């Protein structure tokens, strides 16, 4: 191979690596938003007594496939929540729900969400819990 060919291959490889290093993972620092609502069933003695969108519920945001919560917010009085300033990527939103048959009588409820472009507002499916 000629020295110029080796230099060209090296240069192309360097540009490829630099481009990948500049990509942001899912998380903060972008211009997109995830929003959604929390719907709850009120249980009394194991019977559904009431239901509706509910306020003051903790909602967690997980970046990529993190098992831990990277961000947290609470729902408004109408059950709405949002996470702002996010980059493109895959996320999960979750709540903790009561569960009579689960360990510690609670379980996680998760929904997958993907932001595909900048300045996008994505509406997540309702998170449905029992309280």
Language-model segments: which ranges?
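Structured interaction patches on ligand/partner-binding surfaces of diverse proteins
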Residues: 98-125, 130
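Short, ordered, surface-exposed loop/turn motifs in non-cytosolic proteins
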Residues: 32-34, 40-67, 88
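Bacterial Sec-dependent N-terminal signal peptides
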Residues: 17-42
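Short Pro-Gly-centered beta-turn/loop motif in secreted/extracellular proteins
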Residues: 82-90
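Sec-dependent bacterial lipoprotein signal peptides
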Residues: 1-21
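Residues that flank catalytic or metal-binding motifs in active/ligand-binding sites
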Residues: 55-57, 77, 109
């Amino acid at each position: 191979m000629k020295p110029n060919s080796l230099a060209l291959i090296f240069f192309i490889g360097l540009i490829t690596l630099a481009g990948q290093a500049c990509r942001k993972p899912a998380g903060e620092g972008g211009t997109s938003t995830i929003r959604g609502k929390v719907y709850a069933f009120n249980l009394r003695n194991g019977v559904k007594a009431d239901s509706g969108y509910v306020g003051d519920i903790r909602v967690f945001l997980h970046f990529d496939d993190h098992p831990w919560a990277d961000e947290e917010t609470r729902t408004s009085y109408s059950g709405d929540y949002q996470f702002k300033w996010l980059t493109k990527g895959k996320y999960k939103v979750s709540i903790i729900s009561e569960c009579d048959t689960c360990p510690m009588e609670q379980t996680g409820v998760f929904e997958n969400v993907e932001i595909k472009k900048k300045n996008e507002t994505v509406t997540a499916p309702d998170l449905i819990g029992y309280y």
